[in-house]
Amino acid sequence: MENAKCYAPQILVGTEGLPREQWLEYRRKGIGGSDAAAVLGISPFRTGRDLYYDKLNIVTADDAENWVQLEVGTLLEPLVAKIFAHKTGYKIYRRPFMFQHPLYPWMLADLDYMAELPDGTTAILEIKTTNYNAKDNWWYNGEEIVPIYYESQGRHYMAVMNIDRVYFCCLYGNSEDEAMIRRIDRDMAYEEELIALERDFWENHVLTKTPPPYVEADGDLILESLRRKLGPADKDAPPVLLGQTQFGQLSMLLSLQEQKKALSADVSKLDKDIKRLKGMLIERMGTSCTAVYNGLAESYTITYNPVRSAGISKDALERLKDKHPDIYNQYVTVSEWRRFHVKKAALQAA
């Protein structure tokens, strides 16, 4: 990018005390750092189509589904920033503004913190929290990494702010030792490609109100996106006539189902063999919950512990509905899902 070192970010709006609804309205004026992964099709949280709907305020993400996770992240942000400052010795501070790229006004940045480095330069600091099991996303083959969906966020911010370094501090436990610090430096080739893809998303989809195609590899993410957009099924709607494009998709789907069916037969046989061997071991254990094998080269401990859970049978649920409808209606929720099924029609005689 020819003007990489010749610009300063513009301030779109001050965020100190800005009501959330107004903040969201300003975010819809462009693409933010946390939007970048969805534009690239690498977000584990939402699709590019979800982002498109959000920018046009058609369908927004349901924060109620993960409100605890969002609230924990917000509450812990100052603490994690303090941990970063303590570990590095860098001075950190906030700049409570939503920034805008002067050359690409649809590129926005709302930063967590800034860090003042010993050489007098400034870096961006992004705060993250995760659970213990997800900490492995910050490693690859024993090497420290930044997850690609967060990397795109950091590189977006570097482009907007014209800053050459981003630090991430991610807390996965309840002690200072369970905070990971990662650093990425500016990559102009990555940045140019990111800007081109974001420009295409903004100008050719958002501004023209043309939904982007689903390009994500995660089918569950796509189905959840469609569920939010489409809502309940309409049983009175006429059948939809599919064209050649959809026939190609259908043919591939049927082929994959056949492959899965063949593999499932092998899996089913393996499951039966595993259960047979498990039965032999359980027979030897009897009523004991533990068994031990002590060999010369290796040792094993088997546990077969009881697991109890509360539940209610379908028959009991029907009796509850009949005898105590007030209690039933208070605690039972009815959810709707749609079953996808393909049936090959018989060819009609000419």
Predicted regions located by residue number:
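Extended, charge-rich alpha-helical segments
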Residues: L103, S251, A262-A350
